[in-house]
């Protein structure tokens, strides 16, 4: 992984700005690697329609956000991407208010065009300087996003600022052990208390394997031949560096919940 923070952020922004232009499909709503839920989670948090396109990417949001019991709460997603996750949360879990911010203008434009959900709003914004008042939200979601931020410690300080007392950050991401340790340190320094920390690597690996035929078919159909290898790496397909590093334990995909004391 690229360790220079500014370069890493610029590379991710370039990727996220380019992706919608090459894959403008209105029904391609998600960019996460997907999640294969356990039977226990299906029982505890309910099932979703497993016939839907990209349902495992939808499941990543469902089994993260459902833990927040967001009904009648105000929810912010930082790094809302193509908007499918926030739309699922808004339509299925029915928060009082759902707002997404993303630093990629093309992603926000895609959301405005394809997600006309009355309770969801999409804005262009900076995760390190969020355009919101103090204590404005009950829940902050962050899905496979903050590893790309130039200043993750500042992002977590901003999360703590915009959360109400008793509110919580619900985050999933992929990184190596040393990088997770830094995130835990920055979380504590921001004044957030780690409440849940779960390794979900196997669930993600299984989702990647099961979704391989669909991803390959889409890439073959829409991506020029000379770019397919790059897109397979970006999508985390079977055989990609990310997939192999997840399988061999070099990096971990984790779900954390961090609470602002109230």
Predicted regions and their residues:
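Conserved Class I S-adenosyl-L-methionine
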Residues: 202-262
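A short glycine-rich, Lys/Arg-flanked "PGG" loop and its adjoining helix->strand segment in the class I
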Residues: 153-165
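A short acidic, Gly/Pro-enriched loop at the edge of an enzyme's catalytic core
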Residues: 128-140
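Conserved beta-strand signature within the Rossmann-like core of class I S-adenosyl-L-methionine
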Residues: 167-173
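N-terminal auxiliary segments of SAM/dcSAM-dependent transferases
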Residues: 1-30
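A short SAM/SAH-binding and catalytic strip from SAM-dependent methyltransferases
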Residues: 139-150
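Class I SAM-dependent methyltransferase SAM/SAH-binding core
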Residues: 76, 82-129
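Conserved alpha-helix/loop element of class I SAM-dependent methyltransferases that forms part
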Residues: 39-40, 54-71
